[in-house]
Regions:
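Charged, alpha-helix-forming regions
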Residues: 1-246
Length: 246
């Protein structure tokens, strides 16, 4: 499993995977690692293979595992993936054209939507790449989702994101105040990704005039050890210049 690589278009990182559990994310990335560069061909997994790829440790019956797999696609279908093309048309789509789970055969068969196979096929630039085993070893769903975004900027070692986008991308409850974001979101991220990537999280504040109260949290800068990729180009950074004043 150590050789399995997940690779997809950076556009996939713009989609928040709402209500996905840590196991849901592991299964989705395991599937993504195998359908990559297969075009729209059907790809079949045995349950045992999929469990191994996802690093699943708990014991589950075939029926339980089939329901877990089906839940992943239900959540994908509920998301309404969308992006804008060069003509600025807003296009919504389902990622998989076929997603067949068979408890009796103990198999999953999937095929990627033909119109949007570009997300997982023939990627030469502007893509996110990481090791599946490293991803599945993470425990927190917040750490997993942050990890994916950091890997988009693996050559620069910096991800800048506004508070608004951070909430959306990591599906942070709207009710969370900064103190709760620190405790329930950033703490597991720092605990797991700090040692792994030498991650440092810098909080960005909008300074107010004297006597106008405390500065407001407006974003984050995630700094980590960049990867060295021979002949590669660095990924673009997110511009926070309009909303962040250090």
């Amino acid at each position: 499993m150590s050789d399995e690589i997940v690779k997809y278009s950076n556009q996939f990182n713009n989609q928040a995977l709402r209500k996905f559990t840590a196991l849901d994310l592991d299964l989705l990335m395991a599937i993504a690692s195998r359908v990559r560069d297969k075009g729209t061909d059907e790809v079949a997994f045995t349950f045992e293979e999929l469990k191994r790829l996802a690093g699943l440790q708990r014991n589950m019956t075939n029926d339980e595992f089939a329901k877990q797999i089906a839940n992943v696609n239900r959540r994908l279908l509920a998301l309404n993936f969308e992006f804008q093309n060069e003509e600025h048309d807003i296009i919504q789509f389902a990622l998989f054209a076929g997603f067949v789970t068979s408890p009796t055969k103990r198999t999953l068969t999937v095929s990627v939507n033909s119109r949007f196979s570009f997300l997982l096929n023939d990627l030469t630039s502007q893509f996110t790449r990481f090791e599946l085993a490293e991803f599945t070893a993470l425990r927190s769903s917040y750490a997993k989702e942050c990890y994916r975004r950091l890997k988009q900027y693996r050559q620069t070692g910096v991800w800048k994101v506004s508070l608004e986008d951070f909430r959306r991308l990591l599906d942070v409850p709207k009710s969370y105040r900064p103190s709760e974001i620190n405790k329930y979101v950033l703490k597991p991220i720092e605990e797991e990704l700090g040692p792994l990537l030498n991650l440092k999280v810098h909080r960005k504040y909008l300074k107010k005039k004297p006597g106008r109260g405390r500065a407001s949290l407006v974003g984050f800068e995630f700094e980590f050890d960049p990867e060295k990729v021979p002949g590669g180009k660095g990924a673009p950074r997110v511009d926070l210049s309009r909303s962040v004043r250090e």
